[in-house]
Amino acid sequence: MLKVNVDKRILDICPQMKIGLIQADVVNGDTCDELWNELLKEADNIKNSYELLAINNRPAVAATRKVYKALGKDPGRYRVASEALCRRIIRGLGLYRLTTLIDVVNLVSIKSGYAISGLDFDKIEGDTLTLGVGEAGEVYNGIGRGALNIENMPVYRDAIGGVATPTSDEERTKFTPETTTVQININGYGPEMDMEETVNLMVDLLKRYAQATNIQTSIVSNFD
């Protein structure tokens, strides 16, 4: 598995951070009806459980927003992806039906509240991902967003640059229909759903819907 390092600036804010890591060989494709129905069922649960303004208070979302604020980033302007998905659901805007891998990650994201990085393993450069802090002027193209200002935002970097933030993953390492190996990081800046349970849920969904094999998992903490 890839090695994961975390910058001291982030650990100083959330010293109890846990990251669930999953690497697996998969088959991507159009989202099947069974997966889509699971996603819709969880969306209904979110809609029935939260008012719009209460989403910010979900423990995992609140913890991620706390990191943004502590680093000097406005989490109201640059929303955490799990928060943005839940807000969209509550506002009645629905979800986009995308591909199997994207919708599996989206399902776990809204259920757990965690910011989840879903990457094409074969597009990652090097053998290490480092979670650090975005710099002024750093080039980063968010998926479907174009240039994203990641200054003072938590960002995973590989050997050549940024690949994931809690707001958006990077175009360079995104899932495509041709993706055959995934690297998924479940980022627990603060606890909500049990991390082992969250990793197991992700693995189960990947097995059922993406024909996952050669699965490796790990939960990392105590980065000192």
What are these regions (language model features)?
Residues 1-224:
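Charge-biased, low-complexity intrinsically disordered regions
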